[in-house]
Structure formats: C-alpha cells, structure tokens
C-alpha cells in the first residue's frame, strides 16, 4: 500500500506543475520511499529526499559493496556445509538394515565436499586479493595456520587433488549387522593408507603422517574437516570486519545525522504525468541503510564474532 491519495485535487496537480515546470510529463521524478509497518501491513511512505540524493545513493552503494563481501563468503560456506550434510545423511541412510550399499554415491558425495571446501578457501582468498590486495599476505596466513594446525584440513586439501588425478577417496566400504539394534547396520567408510601410499600420487611431507596413522575413518575425517573450515569461516569474517568496521560506523553515523532511521528505504520513480494522475504507478530501487548495516552485525553475532548490546 502507498500512503498517498490515488486521486489528486486540481490544486495539488497545479502545485506539481508549478514545482516541476521545467519537466515534461514524460520525465521521471525521483522521491524517497520508506517502508513502515501499520497494523501488520507494510506501507510505503513517499517523501522528499532529506539530503542530496547522490550522497544517499553513494552511501547505499558503499554498504552494498561491504554487504556483498560478507554475503558471498556466507554463500560459499553454506555450499560446503550442504555437501557435508549430504555426505553424513547418506552415511545415516546406509545404516538402515535393508538399504543397499553404493560405493559410487559415497565417493561422489565425498568428492563434492572436498571440492567445495577448497572452493570456499580459494574464493575467500581471491576476493581479498581482488579487493584488498595489500592485505592479502596477512589474510593468507589464516589459511596457512589452519593447514599447519589441522591434520584433517591439510589431508583433505591433498585428498581432493588425489581424487581429481589418481583415484576415488574412499577405498573400502564395510557393512555388518548391528546386534544391538536389529533395524540398523554398522557402516564403516575407510580411506586405506596402503591404497594411498602405493598410488602414484606425491604426498610430499604428508606421506610420513599417513604412514604413522591407521586407516582413516572417512566420517570422522569429514567431521574434523568441517570443524576446520568453520574455524576458517569465523577467521575470514573477523578479517573482513577489521577492514570494514570503521567505515560501517561512519556510514551509520552519516545516515543518523541525515535523520534516517532503522527501516528499509528505496528510491521511488514516477513520471510527472503519473505523479499527477496515477501516483500509485511507481517503480522502486532499494537503498541500503541502517537496517542493512545492522543485518551484517546480527550475522556476525550469530557466528560468535561480535556481541550485540541492547541499549534500550
């Protein structure tokens, strides 16, 4: 609903003609729109711009650019998590007594999550390299630290290359009756170390680690890999916040000084003719503002990066 009269009086139409005498009826007039809730209905209130329109658009664009960096990172992370859950769900399905084993599906899901994990890291690093080149070396250290600290991360990094060029990642799938629960079977998905070490793949420094270990439980490996990627996701978000926090605070102060509030805004476009005779005939373009800045910090609070304080 638009809070404006659908039919204007002759006096109102005369006022529009006088105000926009320099415009033709086909010219577009832009106004500021604000969405407000009233009795559970979202209304669009249309007003004049409180400041220079171009200044408001510039602020919106800056918020949008920052928001997209966080959002793209979140999308890539969710893709990885989705692949992990698909793999774990398949493993649970295989535990059903009458469910047949399928080595093809197991390896397909495993290869998906190995690829999406690497894709997540590659995307994050490329985004920083493109937008914040001077900070890339510091950012890359986050990935290097995780590689050094987590066997699951560095092993899966190499296992992904192995599965692309040499062979399937999971070499053994065992299923036996669960004598505690007659309706379930016990599933074991193994990455056998002899299978890896006897292949043509160059494991480099990782070879000694593999030799020192028993065969690797694929399910436990995936869970540890997910933890490692989740740690990286948090560290990447911290890094982005350190880059953008001061600018976000300044943008927030500017919007508050302009008298804008924590609501959704847009640019409303109408021809001069429609403004006079059909004011509800509009097109809108979103303007990012305080609510969108808040949304960035809300997500960061959800993943434990910041703590929000209610000032009320």
Provide a role label for each language-model segment:
Residues 2-107, 138-312:
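Acidic, Ser/Thr/Gly/Pro-rich intrinsically disordered interaction regions
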Residues 105-128, 157, 161-164:
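Short, hydrophobic, well-ordered secondary-structure elements
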């Amino acid at each position: 609903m638009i809070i404006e009269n659908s039919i204007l009086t002759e006096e109102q139409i005369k006022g529009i003609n006088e105000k926009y005498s320099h415009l033709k009826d086909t010219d577009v007039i832009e106004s500021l729109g604000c969405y407000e809730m009233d009795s559970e209905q979202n209304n669009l209130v249309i007003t004049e711009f409180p400041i220079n329109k171009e200044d408001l658009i510039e602020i919106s664009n800056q918020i949008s650019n920052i928001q997209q960096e966080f959002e793209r990172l979140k999308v890539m992370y969710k893709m990885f998590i989705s692949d992990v859950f698909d793999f774990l769900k398949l493993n649970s399905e295989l535990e059903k007594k009458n469910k047949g084993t399928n080595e093809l599906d197991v390896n397909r899901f495993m290869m998906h999550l190995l690829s999406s994990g690497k894709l997540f890291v590659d995307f994050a690093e490329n985004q920083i390299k493109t937008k914040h080149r001077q900070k890339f070396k510091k950012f890359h250290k986050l990935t290097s630290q995780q590689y050094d600290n987590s066997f699951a991360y560095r092993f899966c990094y190499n296992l992904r290359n192995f599965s692309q060029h040499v062979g399937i990642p999971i070499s053994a799938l065992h299923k036996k009756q669960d004598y505690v629960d007659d309706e379930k079977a016990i599933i074991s998905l193994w990455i056998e170390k002899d299978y890896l070490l006897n292949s043509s793949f160059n494991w480099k420094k990782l070879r000694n680690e593999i030799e020192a270990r028993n065969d690797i439980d694929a399910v436990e490996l995936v869970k540890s890999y997910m933890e490692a990627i989740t740690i990286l996701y948090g560290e990447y978000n911290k890094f982005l916040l350190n880059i953008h926090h001061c600018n976000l605070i300044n943008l927030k102060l500017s919007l508050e000084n302009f008298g804008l509030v924590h609501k959704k805004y847009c640019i409303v476009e109408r021809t001069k003719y429609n403004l006079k005779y059909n004011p509800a005939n509009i097109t809108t373009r979103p303007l990012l503002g305080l609510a969108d800045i808040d949304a960035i910090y809300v997500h960061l609070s959800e993943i434990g990066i910041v703590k929000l304080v209610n000032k009320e």
